[in-house]
Amino acid sequence: MKAFFEKLLGFGPDRAIKQIEPIVRRINSLEPSVEALSNAELRAKTDEFKQRLADGETLDDLLPEAFAVVREAARRTIGQRHYDVQLIGGIVLHQGKIAEMKTGEGKTLVATLPLYLNALTGRGCHLVTVNDYLAKVGAGWMGPIYHLLGLSVATISHEYSAIYDPDYVDPKANPDDRRLVHWRPCSRREAYLADITYGTNNEFGFDYLRDNMAWDLAQLVQRELHYAIVDEVDNILIDEARTPLIISGPAQESGDEYRRFATLVRHLKPSPYTPDQIKKQMIEDPEGDFVIEPRSKSIQLTDQGVAKIERLLKIPEGESLYDPKYYRLTHYLDNALRAEFIYQRDRDYIVEHGEVIIVDEFTGRKMPGRRWSDGLHQAVEAKEGVKPRQENVTLATITFQNYFRMYQKLAGMTGTAYTEREEFAKIYNLEVVVIPTHRPMIRKDYDDQIYRSEKAKFEAVIREIEEMHAIGRPVLVGTTSVETSERLSEMLKRRGIKHEVLNAKYHEREARIVAQAGRKGAVTIATNMAGRGTDILLGGNPDGLIEEILAQRGIKIEQATPEQIRAAQEEARRITEAEGKEVRELGGLHIIGTERHESRRIDNQLRGRAGRQGDPGSSRFYLSLEDDLLRRFGPMDRVKGLMERLGVDDSLPIEAGLINRTIESAQTRVEGYNFDIRKHTVEFDDVMNKQRTVIYADRRRILEGENMRERVLDMIADEVHALVERYLPETKGRADDFEEWDIEGLVRAVRTIDPLLDETKLSPEQLEHLSRQEIEDAIMQAIEDDYQEREKAIGEENMRLVERRMMLSAIDRQWIDYLTGMEDLRQEIGLQAVAQRDPLIEYQRNAYAMFEELKANIQRDIVYQIIPVSFQYEQHLRQVEAEQQRRLLAAQQAGAADGNAKGARTVRHSVRLPGRNEPCPCGSGKKFKVCHWGREEELIALLQQRQTDQHAAVAADTPAQPAPQATATRPPTSQVPRGRAAPPPANPQPRSGKSPAQAPRGKGASARKK
């Protein structure tokens, strides 16, 4: 109905195309004049366009000429001319919209148009892909176009960065693949300074986080986030929207508990009921030890299960698993249950070389470097008998949703976006425009066939493969898991059918296998959408046959002469053209889906592998009542009852439009459910995103060398004002109530800020006859004098360096603690719904309070350390920078995380190091974090010397024990502290019993300015 009214009123998808058509006609009219230009004149057009921009013209003014120039450059360099529909796609991308272009319509070529146009501003453009291979190949393929027009293009990956240089030949690259040979290695910064940069979503996001952990401007690599085109935009902005990018460092956590609970949960049995059934049937005491909620992938223990766990853990009678003393155990129990009963090997992950590797549920690809968060990955490792790695603490994090929304202009392209247009509009403010195909689509999409059992379904799939293979039609079989692909592979082997398997275990051969999936008689089994981004050409890809043809002739490709390679290329073209003609006559590529995905879009992507550029093709999905989607979300009972009433045999399918509509209805419900979750994620993450923006902007100002002297003195003035209010209280309107004053306590507290304030500069006797304001002014004047004295002693330039380093160090330290607190808050906030409160509003309120405390803690860190640190500034700066280098090392090793990313190993010392809030073992009486924190090597040397002296004194010969790890216990989330204050060293307390650092914030800065 909505589509009908859109069409009637002229607001449908065709409207945008009609508005663009006059621009396309203008571009076409310029083609003859542009064709007449020489290469030098074509290149000079770039300088002309830049000058016209400087003179006041807009990119829209330049668009027709710029697109005509790019089209001609493409024809001259790579032999491809943009079709009119590709020009339409380019215009849509320039407008900051999403272009839905079907498979094979040339998205890589389309992107050159808006990238060139927007790069004319000199502010940089990014092309975002889903993997390093596509980024490098796409940029290398289009590189000659940009080079002819005088623009630079670079590519980045986790391992390298390189810039396109036609005069450079990479000795390690395949010499026959021109897309890969001209990549000259360069620095990361140089790659971002290129006019156009290709890379993956992970690398762009991680570079942003690394830049915001840098301690020197020279470490920054990215420029402003100006314009980006996201390839496979639905995969990155929807499928991976809930996957945060996390840079983490190691926490100190033992794996023993994970192994213990992995064994314990195997004694538990699942309930036969779902939560919905328990609710509908009002079952008070369900069978089994736990109930699985499939939608949220969570598990809830029954009363019987709780009792069994308490027996297994030997919890004394009268005590409960949920008592505070046992609370930390629920963390391990929950993860062990999910690992054992929800996460399945060869579906959600694989075990390879003693490592648990996550499998992408949408693409079926392995994701090395990614780790589930909050202990889940360690629980899966324990389940599989793999040594659990240390848990990590978050150093920096951002979601793809918030990263890509920072670009001033964002566009995207994919073959399947229209079904998700509402989400793109509401979350990213992106409109989806469906681009017409160059040739009409003639693929046949048959109705689904549904069977009672999974066994009958797979037998039917094999029969269909056999029929297609017998006549020579290529077949691509899409599966949803590694397990299914290997099951089908075994069945085909037993029938003697030659085939290729493409799944998470073999993705290294992905592009090559997919490229040949269109050859006559080819059978390819692909996990979900593996190979996305690689075209399937009917008859096969000739480039992929060259090595095979040479091998048949007894020639290794690296030893072949140019003449032999050319002969092999001709032979490959002849073979693929002949096979392509035969395959078209047979009906083209046939797609078989073995299970419906939760999202219609993923199913459409699989179908879209056939029927490219007007080629023939067909598709059909085979389902069973035992499939996950139907069991979890579909009306399985109704369909099963219908089959029983009709007396349908297990081996006979139901094939009807009604079934298709029923399944699509289930998919629509799931899509809506997942959309709500992602929208919910954005609403919560937006809270932290605003705070992250404030912190990162503050950090950047410090990094760029802004003079922080006045700001530091204002912070000190605030703290002094707060101390004056604490120690010299006003009483019922009387400003100077000397009986309640503790001037000695005030002086002691102030000396923790400025150790130079001895009796000659500031004493209780000097202050006891002054008013409160006069005392505050006298203290600040004395501190400012000492501050100036320190500047003269070490030099103003060095003092500015100390200020910047101290402020960056304080921000980073407190930000890490804050992120941990926010994670805990996010986990516990759902309980607010039980109290009839809106969790989002409560989250916003708590987050605001935590952020205010974060800022106060940062200020305290700086105030109580800046003057003392200036005495050993060189040594302290070395130690602080060494700590930052450790964090940056973790950042360089970071990969995308479904939760926590890999981090560096924790360094174990031969002496025990205290927690940050524990007394420093050096004997100073100060807390560790304001004494030897950041100077661990010095402390270790001191303690080791003491151990040696003690051993010598008692003639003992016992070796030093390894340092115990930081405690693994976690208090209940309601008790987790929100950030960590940085109080001054321990001193005699004021009458209230509170330390000076706990004094409330005051108005000292404003008073000082007066």
UniProtKB/Swiss-Prot annotation:
Gene Ontology molecular function, alphabetical: ATP binding; metal ion binding; protein-exporting ATPase activity
Membrane topology: Peripheral membrane protein
Residues that coordinate or bind ATP: 86, 104-108, 535
This enzyme's EC code(s): 7.4.2.8
Source superkingdom: Bacteria
Region feature Disordered, mapped onto this chain: 893-916, 950-1010
Bias-annotated ranges (Low complexity): 893-904, 950-981
Cofactor(s), names only, from the UniProt record: Zn(2+)
Entry GO terms, CC: cell envelope Sec protein transport complex; cytosol; plasma membrane
GO BP of this protein: intracellular protein transmembrane transport; protein import; protein targeting; protein transport by the Sec complex
One Pfam entry name: SEC-C
SUPFAM superfamilies: Helical scaffold and wing domains of SecA, P-loop containing nucleoside triphosphate hydrolases, Pre-protein crosslinking domain of SecA
Cofactor note: May bind 1 zinc ion per subunit.
Catalytic activity: ATP + H2O + cellular proteinSide 1 = ADP + phosphate + cellular proteinSide 2
Subcellular localization(s) per the UniProt record: Cell membrane; Cytoplasm
Keywords per UniProt: ATP-binding, Cell membrane, Cytoplasm, Membrane, Metal-binding, Nucleotide-binding, Protein transport, Translocase, Translocation, Transport, Zinc
Similarity comment: family membership: Belongs to the SecA family.
HAMAP family: SecA
Quaternary structure and partners: Monomer and homodimer. Part of the essential Sec protein translocation apparatus which comprises SecA, SecYEG and auxiliary proteins SecDF. Other proteins may also be involved.
Described function: Part of the Sec protein translocase complex. Interacts with the SecYEG preprotein conducting channel. Has a central role in coupling the hydrolysis of ATP to the transfer of proteins into and across the cell membrane, serving as an ATP-driven molecular motor driving the stepwise translocation of polypeptide chains across the membrane.
Name of the protein this chain belongs to: Protein translocase subunit SecA
Gene: secA
